[in-house]
From Swiss-Prot:
Family (UniProt): Belongs to the dethiobiotin synthetase family.
UniProt entry keywords in alphabetical sequence: ATP-binding, Biotin biosynthesis, Cytoplasm, Ligase, Magnesium, Metal-binding, Nucleotide-binding
GO biological process terms, semicolon-separated: biotin biosynthetic process
Subunit details: Homodimer.
Subcellular location as annotated: Cytoplasm
Active site: 40
EC number: 6.3.3.3
Source organism per UniProt: Burkholderia cenocepacia (strain HI2424)
Cofactor(s) named in the record: Mg(2+)
Cross-referenced NCBIfam families: bioD
Protein name according to UniProt: ATP-dependent dethiobiotin synthetase BioD
């Protein structure tokens, strides 16, 4: 029996489409014949429906996955206020514990062929006084896919984040260019620069380039991703 795959999805910043790209990846994995599940271990920003607290990002992931996980497994830490998680957690009396997340991930791997773990914010977002999302990626021991929001400043943000991923001893399995600013000048040149630098310095392939979409359509975006290349990269990283 083939061991399950898993990937940690991070971004160059907040609001650059991590959830959108994660959902597109889930659709792509499903089309590839894989049972795909999602974890959003820490979510900040909740709304109540029928007496149940929910999160919009987690809802999007649930809609894209073809393996449904119980909410308490998919998102063990659901914070109500939409702000920096360590600040909200302290206000709400919640301790964001990495061991709990690792245990949830371990259980998710028993239920799916591939588990997409979406981080929160950028690569180094504090979770408590001493640990951040980079520590979470290390604790999970996962290869990373970097979502680059293609807008002014994205080259530096992409290269700095890639370096931070490597400094933690993690593999950058690939990256996705997500065009968040449809009016950006020299978008093609920016993407080409990032592609060349990440290939040379990290051997990280461009998994896909997603055009600006209004409204966002993860199922359509899945066709813009090279899922076969991503699966191979994840398998190589696991060896």
């Amino acid at each position: 029996m083939t061991a399950p795959l898993s990937v940690f999805v991070t971004g160059t910043d907040t609001e650059i489409g991590k959830t959108f790209v994660s959902a597109a990846m889930l659709h792509g994995f499903a089309r590839h014949g894989l049972r795909a599940a999602a974890l959003k271990p820490v979510a900040a920003g909740a709304y109540e429906r029928d007496g149940v607290w929910r999160n919009e990002d987690a809802d999007q992931l649930d809609a894209a996955a073809n393996v449904a996980l119980p909410p308490e497994l998919r998102t063990p830490f659901l914070l109500k206020a939409p702000a920096a998680p360590h600040i909200v957690a302290a206000q709400e009396g919640v301790t964001l514990d990495l061991d709990t997340i690792v245990a949830c991930h371990r259980e998710a791997l028993t239920r799916a062929d591939v588990v997409v773990v979406e981080g929160v914010g950028g690569f180094r977002v504090p979770l408590n006084d001493t640990q951040d999302t980079a520590d979470l990626a290390v604790a999970l021991g996962l290869p990373v896919v970097l979502v680059v929001g293609v807008r002014l400043g994205c080259i530096s943000h992409a290269l700095l984040t890639a370096d931070a991923i490597r400094q933690r001893g993690l593999t950058l399995a690939g990256w996705v260019a997500n065009h968040v600013d449809p009016a950006m000048s020299f978008a093609d040149e920016n993407v080409a620069t990032i592609r060349d630098w990440l290939a040379r310095e990290h051997r990280a392939p461009l998994i896909g380039r997603i055009a600006h979409m209004t409204p966002a359509a993860p199922e359509s975006a899945a066709a813009m991703l090279d899922i076969a290349a991503l699966v191979e990269s994840l398998r190589t990283a696991r060896r």
